Amino acid sequence: MPHHCQPISEADLVAWNIDIRTPDGLGLPVGQGSVAEGKKIYEANCIACHGADAKGGSVYGAMVGGIGSFKTGARVLTPGSMYPYAPILFDYIRRSMPMDRPQALAANEVYALSAYLLNLNGLVPANAVMDQNSLPRVQMPNRDGFLIDDRPDTKAVRCMTNCK
């Protein structure tokens, strides 16, 4: 029987490990991008699905607005309304966008897109430059909208009959 499994090298493992820890952004790559650069990248890669200025297109809904909507019951799901930490936006874009070419964008492009979308949501100024240090510092409106599950991890035998 042929041996198909090979031990993975540390260098190969690093290339696959693109996890980003929130809220501190541990794992964000080196790079940077501005709002102005993000607008150009958005227009070249995103506008067909997400519409002009991320207000919604023929394929997907808006990526702007909805801030505070989680408190009203009519939830509008946008990065500005739902993400508790800005590095989540970077992580999502890097892993899954553009839809037809996921993980095709360089870190600088993802930082620029993040800056642009955060600016459209009114969360950073038009002259903002996002990088591994500035992105985690963005205060997202829904930062306190999640509960931390601090229950202890326990293991117990499942009771199937005569349980108390």
Question: Predicted segment positions?
Answer:
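Electrostatic cytochrome c docking/interface patches
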Residues: H4-I41, G57, P98-P102
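Amphipathic alpha-helical interface segments used for dimerization/assembly
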Residues: C46, L89-F90, R94-M97, Y111-N121
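Gly/Gly-Pro-rich "capping" loops immediately C-terminal to redox-active cysteine motifs
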Residues: K39, K55-R94, P98, Q132
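The canonical Cys-X-X-Cys-His
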Residues: G38, Y42-D53, L113-L117
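Short clusters of hydrophobic/aromatic residues that line enzyme substrate/ligand-binding pockets
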Residues: W16, M63, L135
